């Protein structure tokens, strides 16, 4: 039996959503399933099943996305459901001149230099040693970016997980604890043999990782931001283990909900670098704004941001249930949105393989995502949310 989803299609920010809890297994049976190496996944609202790890990867190879909610099952009640936070987003851009001046400092060369190194790790698979080493290197780059700015109160922290690769959170404090979040996932995967084969992950999601880091670097050039004059706090997140069922982002937002964090928005940047699918199909270059399982108010404001700050337009597209880390934010009641490189059917088909390399990317296109990210973060940092 299926029940209404926590992430109802096209939900408005003002809508309160309640999802029913499916039939529960006895806790002893759950412990036994975990002991046998099984994982509880949620493929859609109310659609849960226990699977082996190989079955998880088989579903991913078939294009299915899901939450891995095994940790919730271990607590005896799943899935957890939360009412959506109500947020009124701006109706117009308020900082165009300042944002455009900042955006002129965004660098394609920096994006390419970063990705050349980031994709040189054998794999960024979340349980691998090279996946942990890539996270350490990424943390150092973020730390250096903050140190080279005048933001004395900004900080970067590791969010540890039971597996090897940690998530990373960079924070720029504002005048309140109201928080604007931008995220990407740092892990990669080769779905043929995840723990053995290389996975450069240039587009998925090295591109998003680089995009938001470059946006952070340029945002820190704003004295108003670095001096803590923005009304709202800004965070940049790099999640671990997205490919395994949004594990890292679920852990982060579960902790935020437990701590009563006041997250006003979350934008995910996952796959920001591939444009050939669009242009080879005879269409003008554009970014893809996801419209399913997202916050309607935030998504509508992002349309204005793209129009105001990017040199290309947008198309509306869908990606399905639990298709990236923004879904974890929504799962815990926080307004979220997702912008991808193109209409979903034109996105890169090279991902999850050895062929997802830097040579396939369009850095001019990535720069447009960086402009959008910078514009959104700056506008919302200074908005009355």
UniProtKB/Swiss-Prot annotation:
Q: Which cofactor does it need?
A: Zn(2+)
Tell me the cofactor note: Binds 2 Zn(2+) ions per subunit.
Q: Propeptide per record: which residue ranges? A: 21-87
Disulfide bonds, paired cysteine numbers = 319-323
The UniProt entry, under InterPro entries, shows: M28_fam (IPR045175), Peptidase_M28 (IPR007484)
Annotated SUPFAM superfamilies:
Zn-dependent exopeptidases
Question: Does the UniProt entry include the keyword Zinc?
Answer: yes
Q: Which domain of life is it from?
A: Eukaryota
Show the GO MF annotations. aminopeptidase activity; metal ion binding; metalloexopeptidase activity
Q: Which family does it belong to?
A: Belongs to the peptidase M28 family. M28E subfamily.
Q: How does it assemble?
A: Monomer.
Query: Under what name is this protein listed?
Result: Leucine aminopeptidase 1
* Taxonomic placement: Eukaryota, Fungi, Dikarya, Ascomycota, Pezizomycotina
């Amino acid at each position: 039996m299926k029940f209404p989803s926590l992430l109802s299609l096209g939900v408005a920010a003002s809508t309160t959503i309640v999802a029913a809890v499916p039939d529960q297994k006895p806790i002893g049976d759950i412990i036994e399933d975990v002991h046998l190496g099984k994982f509880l996944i949620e493929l859609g609202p109310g659609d849960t099943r226990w699977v082996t790890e190989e079955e998880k990867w088989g579903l991913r190879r078939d294009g299915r996305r899901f939450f891995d909610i095994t940790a919730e099952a271990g607590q005896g009640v799943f899935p957890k459901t939360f009412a959506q936070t109500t947020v009124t987003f701006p109706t117009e851009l308020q900082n165009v001149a300042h944002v455009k001046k900042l955006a002129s400092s965004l660098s394609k060369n920096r994006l390419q230099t970063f990705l050349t190194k980031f994709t040189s790790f054998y794999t960024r698979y979340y349980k691998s040693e090279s996946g942990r080493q890539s996270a350490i290197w990424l943390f150092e780059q973020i730390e250096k970016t903050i140190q080279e700015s005048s933001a004395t109160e900004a900080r970067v922290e590791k969010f540890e997980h039971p597996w090897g690769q940690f998530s990373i959170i960079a924070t720029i404090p504002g005048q309140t604890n109201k928080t604007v979040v931008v995220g990407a996932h740092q892990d990669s995967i080769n779905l043929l043999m995840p723990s053995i084969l290389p996975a450069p992950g240039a587009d998925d999601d090295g591109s998003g990782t680089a995009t938001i880091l470059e946006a952070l670097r340029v945002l820190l050039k704003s004295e108003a931001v670095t001096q803590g004059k923005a009304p709202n706090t800004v965070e940049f997140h790099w999640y671990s283990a997205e490919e395994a069922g949004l594990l890292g982002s679920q852990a982060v937002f579960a902790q935020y909900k437990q701590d009563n964090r006041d997250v006003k928005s979350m934008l995910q940047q996952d796959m920001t670098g591939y444009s050939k699918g669009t242009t080879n199909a005879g269409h003008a270059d554009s970014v893809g704004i996801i419209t399913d399982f997202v916050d309607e108010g935030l998504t509508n404001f992002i349309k204005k941001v793209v129009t105001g700050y990017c040199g290309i337009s947008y198309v509306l597209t869908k990606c399905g249930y639990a298709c990236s880390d923004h879904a974890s934010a929504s799962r815990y009641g926080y307004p979220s949105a997702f912008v991808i490189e193109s209409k979903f059917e034109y996105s890169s088909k090279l991902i999850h393989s050895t062929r997802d390399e830097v040579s396939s990317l369009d850095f001019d296109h990535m720069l447009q995502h960086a402009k959008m990210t910078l514009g959104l973060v700056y506008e919302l940092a200074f908005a009355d949310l």
